[in-house]
């Protein structure tokens, strides 16, 4: 297996309009062989992250490893946690169970109102209130639907900051939000990934710190906040 820390802006595998510069292109340059189960355009790819999302991914080098990792994802044995800066004061401990499918009115979007949809479960583990307008949320997903966190947070009125597709652009709010205006992508980072090694069953756990672009925004927000605004909450 290979665990990578994908940068924001990088597409995972070749697709229309993205024949080069993808994660798969980079992997093939550095690795002699990858699992072939995903096909010619997706060698080794067991799961994906959106182009604008940074963070941890596990890649399979061999077919047997791919099959076992795919089973763990299917059986919801893989632990996946993200950090997201969201609008408003979101509540820690909230569980969102809302099926997701392709938006029939916009093929670029997913929706919780689609006719054809699949089960999706998201849990807000911990929340750090940055100021009255913004919260940093630690989020666990128990399923892996396309745009799942982005759709679910938007559906409860707390879209991810910087996510223009799901309503996370600039808002009229209380509190100093000037630092977020420099964001060029959704404030969403895959920060933790845990699974069993596909060969020997050892527990493997990886963590990734916020990348520079997100950390600089968060640090500036905290610097500008009043002490009474900063609060961490758990269920």
Question: Where do the PLM segments sit?
Answer:
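RNA pseudouridine synthases
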Residues: 1-109, 187, 207-235
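Short beta-strand segments enriched for Tyr within beta-sheet-rich domains
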Residues: 69, 145-153
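Short Pro/Gly-enriched beta-strand edge/turn motifs at strand-loop
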Residues: 104-108, 119-121, 172-178
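Residue-level recognition of beta-strand microenvironments
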Residues: 48-49, 89, 127-129, 163
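Short beta-strand micro-motifs in enzyme catalytic cores
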Residues: 2, 133-137, 191
